[in-house]
Every structure is written in structure tokens, then in C-alpha cells.
Amino acid sequence: MSVRTRMTIFGEYRSYNEKDGERNHLKLYVFVKGISEAGEADQNRIDLIGYICKQPLYRETPLGKEITDILIAVNRKHRKSDYLPAICWYSNARLAAELPVGTKVRTMGMIQSRIYVKGDSERTAYEVSIREMEVIE
């Protein structure tokens, strides 16, 4: 195996709240369960089944793109849950905007990061960019 070998990493995307004085920060980690040599195609894919746990926030970007921010609670063993921020685009944005808290959803997307400015500082947000979403009854 060379230094530039493509690898597939699979596992769980987890969240932890970290206290910083009076504030909480949501830290996101990949809990790796396995690593194998990958094929040729680049792929950044995450599949989630969870619940909408915060009121969806719908808006339009300055370029007119429809987006909805959601927070998905994904249950795991031992009565623990991970809270994963996600962003829905276009028709998924319209669907997500109408979903009440507690709705069970299945999503497929990718993990992404983006830079934003808050106050005087530049920050990085990590989120799941949802390509497909369906409500599970």
C-alpha cells in the first residue's frame, strides 16, 4: 500500500457537547469501525435514519437557492443519541421546512464543511448536505 492509496472508512458519525465556560459547542467525530482499500471512485456518503429534533429553519440564499437547516437525532445503543446538523436543498428544503419535530426521516448525503463569519471571527461549520430524504412512517 502506497502513501496515496485511497481508503474506505466506515463507522458512525457521532456528536458530543463540549462546554466552554458558559457556552456549549457541538463536536462531530467519525467513530471508525473499519478501514479497507477503496476502489477508484471518490465517494463521500453518509446514510442516516433519525428524527427531526429542532424546528426546521427555511431560508433563501442571496443567490436564490432554497435551503433548510435541520438537526437530526440518530439513536444508538445504550439510550444515547447523536445530534447531527444537516442542510437540505431545493425540493428537500421545501419538504424539510414543513416537517414537525419528531418526524422520522431517512437521508442520504455527504459530510461537508463551510466557512462563515460570526462577529469578528471566521468559523467553520460541519454538516450533512442532504441529497435525498424521505419520511418514514
Name these PLM-found stretches:
Residues 1-137:
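Single-stranded nucleic acid-binding surfaces, predominantly the OB-fold ssDNA-binding core
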